[in-house]
């Protein structure tokens, strides 16, 4: 492959007391996935925390967050591992903290646990030449390919799809440097860091 990869970002929303800045959010930190390459051990790539306020859009069931009001408060975060809950594939963690009471009415937090995996950066300038070389190897070996198919780009994630849900939602997104650069080039520099936009 290209030797480049991104990170999987696992997210969970929680409550924050705007008076004290107290928050506490639990989630299952992933430890091992199994996919087309076999089992892989997931590497912890850190936790980030953002404070925000969501507002109800009148007359609709939707909530909205002003992206400019999202503030990173990772410096307040502590991660507690519940050792008794650790299994080969996951462990329960609590991300909690206090502080930044000066942030006004921001009464929610967004916790992002990142993981390193060997998945390729599909948006890297090296990706297309690598894939062309791979197809050429098949042709040189006498294998004629009429088409290539994949029902999901991220076949390198995990086959246990429903173990990655929080509150009924698939709570993981793959972000690579190449993807972030493509978005930033097209939509603005603020998209060079995707974590708060998940």
Set out the residue ranges of the language-model regions:
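Acidic/aromatic-lined carbohydrate-recognition and catalytic surfaces
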Residues: 1-98, 102-104, 111-128, 155
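Short alpha-helical segments and helix-capping/turn motifs at coil-helix boundaries
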Residues: 129-138
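Residues that line or immediately flank small-molecule/substrate-binding pockets and catalytic motifs
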Residues: 152
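Extended, H/D-rich, highly charged conserved domains that either
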Residues: 160-161, 165
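Active-site-proximal, well-structured secondary-structure segments within enzyme catalytic domains
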Residues: 168-198
